[in-house]
C-alpha cells in the first residue's frame, strides 16, 4: 500500500550497486527501514542528496504487510536547510545526533511528542545564529525524557553524588561504581537547567563540555541494551576544542 509521510533521516547504508537502505524516523510509524534506488539520471524521483544526516523529507513508500523493509517511490525535501549542511560545526553535530538517534530510537510506533521534539530541535539548530556549542548536550539530556531516563532532580543538594544507575542524586556514595562525584554531579544539575534559548548563558570550558559528553554517552550505555560508544564522539570533542 502506497503511503505518504514525512520523516527524519537517521542512517544510510550502501546495500548494493543499485540500492541503499535508509533508516528514517517517521511521523506516523516511528522508526522504519526503506530501500532507496540509486538514481541513474537527473530526472530520478529520488535524489541521493536528500538522505543526509537529520534531513527532513516528505516521501511516498510502498508499505507491505509482513515486511520490515519498504521501498521509497518518491521523495522531496520537507524542510530545506538554510545553514546546517554548510556550517562545519552544525553538520558535525547533525552527524553525531543522527548516529545517536540511530542507536537510541528503536520503537516502530507513532510517537507524536517525540517527533515534534526532534523536528523542533533540528529546525532550531538550522536557524540558530548565536552560540550553540552546548546544543548537543541539551539535546541528549532533554531526549532522555522520552525514554523514561530523565534524572530526578528533586533531591539535589550541593555535595550530592549522582547515581547513574538509578538516575537520581543521593547524599551517600553508592555502593556500585556507576556514579558521579559531587563536582561532576553539579555539572549534570547545571546541564538539566539549560534549554536551547538559555544555554548560551551558561559558561562551560572545553574540558567540562567534553566530559559531559562522555558522561551522557556512558549514561545511555548503562540504560539501553547494546548502546555503543558512538563513533562520532571524538569528532565532536575535537570540534569544540
Curated annotation (Swiss-Prot):
Question: Could you give a single Gene Ontology term from the biological process aspect?
Answer: double-strand break repair
> What GO cellular component is one of the record's annotations?
bacterial nucleoid
> Record keywords: Transferase included?
no
Q: Sorted alphabetically, which Pfam families does this protein's record hold?
A: RecO_C, RecO_N
Q: What residues form the membrane-spanning segments?
A: none
Q: What does this protein do?
A: Involved in DNA repair and RecF pathway recombination.
Question: What name appears for this protein in its UniProt entry?
Answer: DNA repair protein RecO
